[in-house]
A protein has these predicted regions:
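Short amphipathic alpha-helix that is part of the acyltransferase structural core
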Residues: 1-64, 69-78, 144-191, 225-230
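Intrinsically disordered, low-complexity, positively biased terminal segments
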Residues: 2, 8, 151-396
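Short coil/turn motifs at secondary-structure junctions
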Residues: 65-67, 87, 120
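Conserved acetyl-CoA-binding loop-helix of GNAT-fold acetyltransferases
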Residues: 81-84, 89-106, 237-248
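Conserved active-site alpha-helix within GNAT-family acetyltransferase domains
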Residues: 106-111, 116-137, 263-280
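Aromatic-anchored glycine-rich loop motif in surface-exposed flexible loops
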Residues: 133, 139-147
Length: 396
């Protein structure tokens, strides 16, 4: 028998051990991990009445977050630390955990949930869709790195790590207001996830370095002749050019690696010699789930005035199923209707297009969205349009 219940504080170490078993990692800083897990809402699936009585068989962590969406922010359940012991697989534990998360999110008034997927096909079945992607670059700086964009010439300065939350916080908030997909960062997140003394994923890199400009910042580390860019926010292309110029000119280094950049990053277009910039990867980033479809659709701004009838399928949340009249524009609305649909789609595909990063027209071509009214996909794309591609750089 499996019983779901909240995981008490004295079981946090059991959650850490379960995660290490499932994700095959070595625990190098238990105290910091314990601090992180202690901050979450924790759901545990306990085996009751068998030979492993009171086993922690599966788990899920949820952080109460704010997600930047076009025109504002929405309360969001940030799902993490999900796992089921190999001895308890195929017993419906993950389904039970996700259903519980959906119910908790609805009760807390969070219309969306989000996660990073270690195995993407799993979460599509639960209504999650890829809402944004990341791309990676390598820049050859063994020779001068010229730019077509004139860099902003105001001075840059290095910032002490302890001042990062106060100085970078407002800059990041402005960046998130411009670009959907950002998650709120508190002081703990800045110091422990953005600029920890040691990068647990790449321990060969040195201490974090933070360079700031009145209108932006860049966080990087170095190792040998390599500069690794972790995060950058720039309010104008000229400020962005100033950071690339700075990173390319660091003495004794020959390359910049930037594995986690937005898909519309300007560096490939800024470079005077495009051959100095190599695209090294493209990967799914944030998976989004619309827990409350009408609240989510009313909760973002829209780029065009229009009206659509959407026929939404949802295998997990009955309240989302059916036909919705979506009115876009200055006063968005979403109400139930019996009218014929313009578009029919699964809630996972609605999540994929929600932040403006995936064209509806593309999903029509893929075959996962049905266009019943000719031109409806293009019209919805026009309403969903955002000036900057959605981007999430906080892997939780």
């Amino acid at each position: 028998v499996i019983e779901l219940r909240n995981v008490p504080a004295d079981d946090v170490d059991r959650m850490i051990d379960l995660a290490a078993t499932v994700f095959h990692f070595r625990i190098t800083d238990r105290d910091r991990m314990r601090d992180w897990v202690s901050r979450m809402e924790r759901i545990g699936a306990y085996g009751i009445g068998g030979p492993g009585e009171d086993d922690l068989a599966g788990q899920m962590g949820v952080a109460a977050q704010r997600l930047s969406v076009p025109g504002g922010e929405l309360d969001c359940s940030a799902v993490t630390f999900v796992g089921v012991l190999p001895t308890y697989r195929r017993r419906g534990i993950l389904s039970s955990l996700i259903d519980r998360m959906h119910a908790d999110a609805a009760a807390a008034g969070r219309p969306v949930a989000a996660l990073w997927a270690s195995e993407g096909p799993i979460y599509g079945r639960y209504g999650f869709g890829v809402a944004d992607r990341r791309t990676g670059f390598k820049v050859d700086t063994s020779r001068p790195f010229g730019l077509r964009t004139v860099p902003d010439d105001r001075p840059l300065r290095l910032l002490d790590r302890e001042r990062v939350p106060d100085v970078l916080g407002p800059m990041y908030a402005r960046e998130s207001a411009r670009r959907p997909g950002g998650l709120a960062r508190d002081e703990w997140w800045w110091l422990n996830r953005l600029v920890p003394h040691r990068d647990e994923r790449s321990p060969e890199y040195g201490e974090p370095r933070v360079v700031v400009h009145p209108e932006g910042y860049a966080i990087y580390r170095t190792q040998g002749r390599t500069v690794r860019l972790y995060d950058m926010a720039a309010e104008t292309p000229r400020v962005e050019a100033a950071f690339w110029t700075y990173l390319a000119s660091i003495d004794l280094t020959h390359e910049i690696v930037a594995p986690e950049r937005p898909v519309d990053d300007l560096v490939t277009r800024m470079a005077a010699d495009p051959d100095q910039v190599t695209v090294t990867g493209d990967s799914a980033a944030l998976w989004l789930r619309l827990v409350d479809v009408p609240a989510a659709l009313r909760g973002r701004s829209w780029a065009a005035d229009d009206t659509f009838v959407l026929d939404v399928a949802d295998a997990r949340i009955p309240g989302n199923r059916g036909r919705w009249r979506l009115t876009t524009g200055a006063a968005p609305g979403c109400e139930r209707t019996g009218d014929a649909p313009d578009l029919a789609l699964d809630v996972a595909d609605l999540a994929a297009v929600y932040l403006g990063g995936t064209p509806v027209r593309t999903l029509v071509r893929v075959g996962t969205v049905d266009e019943h009214t000719p031109g409806a996909a293009d019209r919805l794309d026009a309403a969903l349009a955002v000036p900057l591609a959605p981007y999430t750089n906080d892997n939780f």
